[in-house]
Regions:
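One-carbon transfer enzymes
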Residues: 1-178
Length: 178
């Protein structure tokens, strides 16, 4: 039986496209919030598949959409909003975070890879975690790390992206039964 997969994003959706192509499976539903055009350009591979919600969607708006699915796996890919507690408690939601919060809890929140790079952290990485109502507070279920000694900013972006994609692909293969 096919497991429903729902994704949320607030930025470009590029990560979703790369994961989907690698898995040879697209999400059953792709949700993004309405934002001014100058703040982002959505990956053209997603444009036809996207459902828009308000910039700051209400619990009711989210529940109306999600309730149509039976026990879906929900993944967040650059979703720049805190999920309401009632949604977190009712659904299995996972987030990818580009900061090694298992080692550096101060990297919770937006753009941790930039903070780690500028702070010359010796080890960097990313995690997948269960989503609860707090920002990056849920239980970490997987992590990938890399030596960040003397890397360039470009190398940091590539290493973080590659490790994040690896985590997502391996997690989704198991979770979606692929």
């Amino acid at each position: 039986m096919k497991k429903d997969w729902i994704v949320f994003f607030s930025q470009t959706g590029n990560e979703i496209v790369e994961i989907s192509k690698s898995l040879k499976r697209w999400p059953d539903l792709i949700i993004t919030n309405k934002r001014p055009d100058h703040l982002r350009a959505i990956n053209p591979d997603l444009e036809e598949k996207v459902v828009y919600v308000e910039n700051r969607p209400s619990t009711e708006e989210l529940e109306e959409i999600l309730s149509k699915y039976d026990n879906p796996i929900i993944t967040l890919h650059g979703w720049l909003r805190v999920m309401p507690a009632s949604i977190c408690e009712k659904y299995s939601i996972f987030n990818g975070h580009p900061g090694l919060i298992t080692e550096y809890p101060e990297l919770k929140g937006k753009d941790p890879q930039i903070r780690a790079f500028e702070g010359k952290y010796p080890v960097m990485g990313c995690v997948l975690h269960k989503v609860i109502a707090g920002v990056d507070e849920g239980r970490v279920i997987a992590e990938e790390r890399f030596n960040a000694f003397n890397i360039t900013e470009e190398e940091m972006w590539k290493a973080t992206r590659d490790r994040s994609l690896y985590l997502w692909i391996e997690f989704l293969k198991i979770t979606l039964g692929l």
